């Protein structure tokens, strides 16, 4: 060997770095992502901590909405995460793309018609299998069958209404990700918008008015002329309402319940509520929680149309099947069923979960990644008559979707 060759080879190897060491640019990107996700998670933790200490979620939320500095910092961090980090690490599992895909399937590719056909078959079957009904129940069922009949002019109009643009309300929109899709007439709202195209609106305190008695093109024109900020909206205005990473933001299950109830009132009959909520555990670990959410949301007058599990989130689509909310809060605590694992953490648990105190090891990351699989839609599709299995609830300390590494 040429003298000094060994030394030169060693130097080259050192310059190249270990094969397991990410390049400097990648390290910088990960550090920035951890910093941004720390901003977001600290806001969530502070809200939950205040809720445990005070208990008055109205007061806590009012103070939170007045803290403009924190809200602006949160909005900038979320937009940066979405623009520069999530889009690069979620290929094939994008939440926005999933929402668009479900809307196309439902409104443009026959999904809505198939769901309504199943409703009609179930109603007909109920008349054959149910013992003698009293006169009131019988007249109710006959009315339901009339509404479902494919010869009913109103039913045909309902099917054709979405032939124009799909009116979509994106709650907690931040940076208005649906604006770029031509098939949507999008209204994005947020308590602190990150871009000018998003309207300022506190959805929890949004006032609802009587539905507009206007033609479809007139309703579209109304939406294009909304004033900023938005304090009130007519009911039955949208074909789609999106809650993307929204419900876990709130510290109280009752606040999540209020959001779902308002979504029901804002949707047209057979409109879709799309819910995405973070969860990095394997597909069955929080099955009990998802079953609980399904029961609570369906009690409002929804029926689940689709469910998917991605590596870092649950994705659910519910269709509005009744004009009135039907939930009976006397016999069952439906709001309490919209829980998240963090609701059960103590203040000490939240403080321990601070990223500066604990960072998951590479081995733990690999073990976590090993359990990541996508849950197929069909077996857990309510419209197919299937149900979801339950499992023991698992308490998580963080919102793992924020660190998609």
UniProtKB/Swiss-Prot annotation:
<dbReference type="GO" id="GO:0008168">
    <property type="term" value="F:methyltransferase activity"/>
</dbReference>
<protein>
    <recommendedName>
        <fullName>S-adenosylmethionine sensor upstream of mTORC1</fullName>
        <ecNumber>2.1.1.-</ecNumber>
    </recommendedName>
</protein>
<dbReference type="InterPro" id="IPR021867">
    <property type="entry name" value="Bmt2/SAMTOR"/>
</dbReference>
<keyword id="KW-0808">Transferase</keyword>
<comment type="function">
    <text>S-adenosyl-L-methionine-binding protein that acts as an inhibitor of mTORC1 signaling via interaction with the GATOR1 and KICSTOR complexes. Acts as a sensor of S-adenosyl-L-methionine to signal methionine sufficiency to mTORC1: in presence of methionine, binds S-adenosyl-L-methionine, leading to disrupt interaction with the GATOR1 and KICSTOR complexes and promote mTORC1 signaling. Upon methionine starvation, S-adenosyl-L-methionine levels are reduced, thereby promoting the association with GATOR1 and KICSTOR, leading to inhibit mTORC1 signaling.</text>
</comment>
<dbReference type="InterPro" id="IPR029063">
    <property type="entry name" value="SAM-dependent_MTases_sf"/>
</dbReference>
<dbReference type="GO" id="GO:1903432">
    <property type="term" value="P:regulation of TORC1 signaling"/>
</dbReference>
<dbReference type="GO" id="GO:1904262">
    <property type="term" value="P:negative regulation of TORC1 signaling"/>
</dbReference>
<dbReference type="GO" id="GO:0005829">
    <property type="term" value="C:cytosol"/>
</dbReference>
<feature type="binding site">
    <location>
        <position position="190"/>
    </location>
    <ligand>
        <name>S-adenosyl-L-methionine</name>
    </ligand>
</feature>
<dbReference type="GO" id="GO:1904263">
    <property type="term" value="P:positive regulation of TORC1 signaling"/>
</dbReference>
<feature type="binding site">
    <location>
        <position position="172"/>
    </location>
    <ligand>
        <name>S-adenosyl-L-methionine</name>
    </ligand>
</feature>
<feature type="compositionally biased region" description="Basic and acidic residues">
    <location>
        <begin position="25"/>
        <end position="34"/>
    </location>
</feature>
<dbReference type="GO" id="GO:0034198">
    <property type="term" value="P:cellular response to amino acid starvation"/>
</dbReference>
<dbReference type="GO" id="GO:0044877">
    <property type="term" value="F:protein-containing complex binding"/>
</dbReference>
<dbReference type="GO" id="GO:0032259">
    <property type="term" value="P:methylation"/>
</dbReference>
<comment type="subunit">
    <text>Interacts with the DEPDC5 subunit of the GATOR1 complex; interaction is disrupted when SAMTOR binds S-adenosyl-L-methionine. Interacts with the KICSTOR complex; interaction is disrupted when SAMTOR binds S-adenosyl-L-methionine.</text>
</comment>
<keyword id="KW-0489">Methyltransferase</keyword>
<dbReference type="GO" id="GO:0061431">
    <property type="term" value="P:cellular response to methionine"/>
</dbReference>
<feature type="region of interest" description="Disordered">
    <location>
        <begin position="1"/>
        <end position="34"/>
    </location>
</feature>
<dbReference type="GO" id="GO:1904047">
    <property type="term" value="F:S-adenosyl-L-methionine binding"/>
</dbReference>
<feature type="binding site">
    <location>
        <position position="95"/>
    </location>
    <ligand>
        <name>S-adenosyl-L-methionine</name>
    </ligand>
</feature>
<feature type="binding site">
    <location>
        <position position="244"/>
    </location>
    <ligand>
        <name>S-adenosyl-L-methionine</name>
    </ligand>
</feature>
<dbReference type="Pfam" id="PF11968">
    <property type="entry name" value="Bmt2"/>
</dbReference>
<comment type="similarity">
    <text>Belongs to the BMT2/SAMTOR family.</text>
</comment>
<keyword id="KW-0949">S-adenosyl-L-methionine</keyword>
<feature type="binding site">
    <location>
        <position position="202"/>
    </location>
    <ligand>
        <name>S-adenosyl-L-methionine</name>
    </ligand>
</feature>
<feature type="binding site">
    <location>
        <position position="203"/>
    </location>
    <ligand>
        <name>S-adenosyl-L-methionine</name>
    </ligand>
</feature>
């Amino acid at each position: 060997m040429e003298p000094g060759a060994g030394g030169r080879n060693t130097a080259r190897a050192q310059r190249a770095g270990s094969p397991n060491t990410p390049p400097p640019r990648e390290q910088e990107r990960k550090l920035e992502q951890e910093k941004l996700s720390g901003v977001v998670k600290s806001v969530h933790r502070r809200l939950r901590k205040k809720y445990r200490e005070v208990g008055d979620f109205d007061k806590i939320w009012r103070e939170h909405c007045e803290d403009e500095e924190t809200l602006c910092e949160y909005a900038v961090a979320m937009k940066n995460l979405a623009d520069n980090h999530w889009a690069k690490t979620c290929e094939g599992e994008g939440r926005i793309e999933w929402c668009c895909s479900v809307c196309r399937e439902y409104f443009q590719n026959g999904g809505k018609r198939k769901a309504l056909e199943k409703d009609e078959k179930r109603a007909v079957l109920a008349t054959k299998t149910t013992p003698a009904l009293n006169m009131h129940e019988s007249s109710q069922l006959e009315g339901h069958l009339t509404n479902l009949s494919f010869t009913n002019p109103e039913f045909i109009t309902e099917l054709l209404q979405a032939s124009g643009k799909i009116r979509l309300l994106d709650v907690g929109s931040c940076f208005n990700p649906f604006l770029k899709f031509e098939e949507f007439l999008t209204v994005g709202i947020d308590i602190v918008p990150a871009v000018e195209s998003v309207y300022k609106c506190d959805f929890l305190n949004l006032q609802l008015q009587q539905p507009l008695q206007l033609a479809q093109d007139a309703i579209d024109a109304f939406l294009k002329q909304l004033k900023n900020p938005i304090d009130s909206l007519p009911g039955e205005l949208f074909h789609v309402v999106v809650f993307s990473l929204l419900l876990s933001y709130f510290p109280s299950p009752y606040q999540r319940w209020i959001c779902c109830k308002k979504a029901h009132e804002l949707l047209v009959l057979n409109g879709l509520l799309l819910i995405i909520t973070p969860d990095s555990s394997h597909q069955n670990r929080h099955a009990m929680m998802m079953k609980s959410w399904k029961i609570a949301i369906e009690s409002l007058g929804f029926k689940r149309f689709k469910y998917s599990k991605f590596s870092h989130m649950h994705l659910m689509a519910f269709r509005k099947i009744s004009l009135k909310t039907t939930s009976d809060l006397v016999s069952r605590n439906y709001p309490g069923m919209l829980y998240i694992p963090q609701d059960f953490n103590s203040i000490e648990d939240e403080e321990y979960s601070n990223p500066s105190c604990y960072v998951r090891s590479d081995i733990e990351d690999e073990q976590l990644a090993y359990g990541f699989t996508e849950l197929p839609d069909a077996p857990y599709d309510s419209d197919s008559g299937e149900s979801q299995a339950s499992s023991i609830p698992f308490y998580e300390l963080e919102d793992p979707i924020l660190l998609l590494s």
